């Protein structure tokens, strides 16, 4: 087939040009039940041409539910995985996903989904943990990776994310490379550490955010590369949810806390490397830092969003490391127009490095993430609404919160329901699912205030959280629950972390029955 001029410029390893194929030519390779790896992380850097061709093949041949795959991606993929879910093309999915169609299929039982700490998922895949039932000794049948260039040695230059690609390539039987000529080359931004399994590992040597010690592309055996496909579709990232009064209040509470920590010598004036999740609260915190007059900040995180660009451009942020740059189209345009400036201040690493517990602890990262709910003793639920309905997955929040110097969770004090504008309290007596334990969190913050939990006993934590974080509509209810639980526990000699199990989930059951967590009374306990 004819090779475009753009593709020839991007593919600098000549033997690969003989392997250029159309996506349609690859369709016969894919069989029901295969194990596939995709590149990508938080919806950027994912393959597009081959997954889209498979969707069309399924549509044209009425193969919905008949051509299904076990799909592994570093985190969430792009819109293609949601189309796969709509066409019943996914048997199993891990470890994180975003989108209504795939979440619906998971919660309807059509897709077997499991989430895992993102620092651990790629390495556990290489151990063969997720393919134990295979009888052919393989782990992945095909790895489909998006590249923005291929170097002279055949190695792969990824795009705006690295994710689990190095590990997936290392255990894939065959590799398909989609070279995206619609996206500028990201060559020079990456720092790749290839996987080494125990007992031959050595420590990651990074002691500063801006250190680069690995290689700037992903090595691959050219013999395993079976096809080069040109892709001409850019990543599609929707607009960020704008900050509102609630998220700005949370950001204000956090920034006041940081200033106080600096004042008392517990943080340096430029803080410590920051990790921030995604969403409007995370964006508001970063926007707040833009105006807070902190200088020479550094970032060690999973995902960079548009809000970080203002920090760079006003001189507050010196350097940022992540495994994904998840920018809107205007955000990418800002970066590409000033590429030399950003290239010298950005590093993209694999997720096993960006989320590595040893490095997070060594660097003293300040971790900030958003839960579904937290309870009065500081356990947090990040994944399952009412204990059962999966949202997206654990992601990397626990990688950071367990190991950070400061572990912070932020959320609105209350959320609306159809019948009550404050029908859901984010602070509950007992969370309906536990992702982060009371041992992981240092600080809980809502739009109502900030609870500093360091060094407090469970009952002290409960009062701090109720007084500082709970919505006024729920403070009396939560305090009444705690008082009654303490009365019960005093009689039974279990006062360390008192609960009334009979009432522990009454907020949730009341919500299911009446559309609000505002319980009218507690059931009596003896």
UniProtKB/Swiss-Prot annotation:
The active site is at 302 (5-glutamyl coenzyme a thioester intermediate). It comes from Candida glabrata (strain ATCC 2001 / BCRC 20586 / JCM 3761 / NBRC 0622 / NRRL Y-65 / CBS 138). This is Acetyl-CoA hydrolase. Presumably involved in regulating the intracellular acetyl-CoA pool for fatty acid and cholesterol synthesis and fatty acid oxidation. It catalyses: acetyl-CoA + H2O = acetate + CoA + H(+). One of its GO terms (molecular function) is acetate CoA-transferase activity. CoA binds at residues 277-281, 392, 396. Its EC number is 3.1.2.1. It comes from the Eukaryota.
